[in-house]
């Protein structure tokens, strides 16, 4: 992992990058959702509780899925007649400020790169990407765009992780030479899927 981080730092000089944005607080943040599967439910629930956010668009590769998703979640007036993320992001009438990318793992990089290239901030579901090369490309796109790329990686806030961190930092275990951990998820990593 250290080698990967060093490669990324060397190629991107990320530590010296400063991102500043001015946001007009007199209007709502206009947000779109790319990928309307099960993880998008968590995103829409959060957005619905934010008074300064307006959900304006959504798309999914499965025709009709985005419209059904927003209807099921009680959100009206959302434009969903897009066949792809590119079509949605190319619609300048939306005036998107940000998108949540809730696609399959293998489909994270392309929409993130395209959104950033269109000047749209990105909230990207974990995992960031599935390869180092994709990660580097997404980070280059962020740097070139001056927009914000945020990775939704919340396990660090999990009470179990916090407890482990506290124990390790306390020194109670002495000097740690090796740790092995594992995890899983119900659905696994869905592959292969077509490039988008």
Where do the PLM segments sit?
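Predominantly a Rossmann-like dinucleotide-binding segment in NAD(P)-dependent oxidoreductases
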Residues: 35, 155-196
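Beta-loop-alpha module in the N-terminal Rossmann-like domain of NAD(P)-dependent dehydrogenases
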Residues: 79-141
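Glycine-centered tight turns that cap/initiate beta-strands
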Residues: 52, 93, 172-175
């Amino acid at each position: 992992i250290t080698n990967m981080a060093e490669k990324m730092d060397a190629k991107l000089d990320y530590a010296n990058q400063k991102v500043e944005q001015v946001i007009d607080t007199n209007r709502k943040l206009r947000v779109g959702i790319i990928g309307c599967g099960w993880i998008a439910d968590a995103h829409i629930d959060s957005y619905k509780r934010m008074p300064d956010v307006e959900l304006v668009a959504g798309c999914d590769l499965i025709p009709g899925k985005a419209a059904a998703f927003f209807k099921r979640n009680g959100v009206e007036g959302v434009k969903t007649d897009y066949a792809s993320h590119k079509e949605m992001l190319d619609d300048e009438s939306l005036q998107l400020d940000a998108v949540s990318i809730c696609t399959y793992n293998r489909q994270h990089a392309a929409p993130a790169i395209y959104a950033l290239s269109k000047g749209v901030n990105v909230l990207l579901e974990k995992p960031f990407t599935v390869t180092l090369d994709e990660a580097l490309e997404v980070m280059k796109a962020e740097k070139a765009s001056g927009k914000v790329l945020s990775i939704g990686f919340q396990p660090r806030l999990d009470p179990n992780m916090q407890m482990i961190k506290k124990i390790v930092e306390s020194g109670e275990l002495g000097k740690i030479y090796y740790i092995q951990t594992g995890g899983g998820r119900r659905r696994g990593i869905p592959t292969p899927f077509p490039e988008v």
